[in-house]
Amino acid sequence: MAAEILEVADLPARVGPRQRLIGIDLGTKTIGLALSDVERRIATPLETIQRIKFSKDAVRLIELAEKFDAGALIIGLPLNMDGSQGPRVQATRAFVRSLSALVSKPFVYWDERLSTAAVTRSLIDQDVSRLKRAEVVDKMAAAYILQGVLDRLRRIEADAV
């Protein structure tokens, strides 16, 4: 099964009215996850998966998608600063292709440039220790990515009125 990739504007028509969204910050060593509320207004950091191998990572992701009745998966697309696509984008797309063979949920890519940097800056401003930052930065970056999509959905709804 090929990955079904949607645009943000397509989500309201394709996702149930109270289905949550899961945000994903895919890294080489970890996968940060975030969850929306059922009204799709607020993103909350959920957990960080320590990457072991794809099959184990996918099992946990699918468990959470089913547990929280997620309607779609929002995955950060790590574009280069100039907007070009490098090796990390290709790795992300390969991950989505592999995951789509196991899950029937649609995916939305969201530009994640500087998301981890923004979260790290915010944590430093809050005087969070380096050790604690390392524990939470990935799931907070996933929440940052997901919140971007939720905010965009709100703008789309406002424009439709």
UniProtKB/Swiss-Prot annotation:
<protein>
    <recommendedName>
        <fullName>Putative pre-16S rRNA nuclease</fullName>
        <ecNumber>3.1.-.-</ecNumber>
    </recommendedName>
</protein>
<comment type="similarity">
    <text>Belongs to the YqgF nuclease family.</text>
</comment>
<keyword id="KW-0690">Ribosome biogenesis</keyword>
<dbReference type="InterPro" id="IPR012337">
    <property type="entry name" value="RNaseH-like_sf"/>
</dbReference>
<keyword id="KW-0963">Cytoplasm</keyword>
<dbReference type="GO" id="GO:0005829">
    <property type="term" value="C:cytosol"/>
</dbReference>
<keyword id="KW-0378">Hydrolase</keyword>
<comment type="function">
    <text>Could be a nuclease involved in processing of the 5'-end of pre-16S rRNA.</text>
</comment>
<dbReference type="GO" id="GO:0004518">
    <property type="term" value="F:nuclease activity"/>
</dbReference>
<dbReference type="Pfam" id="PF03652">
    <property type="entry name" value="RuvX"/>
</dbReference>
<dbReference type="InterPro" id="IPR006641">
    <property type="entry name" value="YqgF/RNaseH-like_dom"/>
</dbReference>
<dbReference type="GO" id="GO:0000967">
    <property type="term" value="P:rRNA 5'-end processing"/>
</dbReference>
<keyword id="KW-0540">Nuclease</keyword>
<dbReference type="InterPro" id="IPR037027">
    <property type="entry name" value="YqgF/RNaseH-like_dom_sf"/>
</dbReference>
<dbReference type="InterPro" id="IPR005227">
    <property type="entry name" value="YqgF"/>
</dbReference>
